[in-house]
Amino acid sequence: FSFELALRGANVLGIDISSNLIEIAKKRLPKNLKENAEFITSDMMQNHGSFDYIILMDSLIHYPEKDTVNILENLLKNTNEKILFTLVPSNFILTLKLMVGRLFPKSDRSPTLSPLNTKSFIEIYRDKFEREYNATVSSISKVSDFFYTSEFLELRK
């Protein structure tokens, strides 16, 4: 998304806690986009200024529900328009896959996921986001293939 947004004239700040991923992004950044895009190693919870849009692709999928809400609340304070984010929707098949994954030695496991019931998440926090931040939360789309499932949501001010 970063390159496409910069190509369309947006000023982009890409943040990741992985310095390796940031270095890859910097190397792949076309020279004509260097004025519009910057990539830094940091934590999304640090204050990096005010943004019109914040996009969190798979950034929240490792956090339990309470932490996810706290992160979104913190980011809403510095958001002018909306936050787009993905969550991993809980379902029987995913629960089964995660249980099977726990059978492997710890070093062979994938990162921890925190699936959430996204429909309940929206229903539970809709009033809170509207009341405290004048923001609406809704689902935009679902992405699913055999190994990857997520739901794309937005918090719009």
What is each model feature region?
Residues 1-49, 70, 74, 84-157:
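Class I (Rossmann-like) S-adenosyl-L-methionine-dependent methyltransferase catalytic domain
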Residues 52, 81:
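Conserved acidic residues
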Residues 55:
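A conserved beta-strand element that flanks and buttresses the S-adenosyl-L-methionine
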Residues 58-59:
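Short catalytic micro-motifs in class I SAM-dependent methyltransferases
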Residues 64-65:
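Helix-capping/helix-break motifs at membrane-protein junctions
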Residues 76-78:
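Short, conserved loop/helix-junction motifs that constitute active-site signature segments
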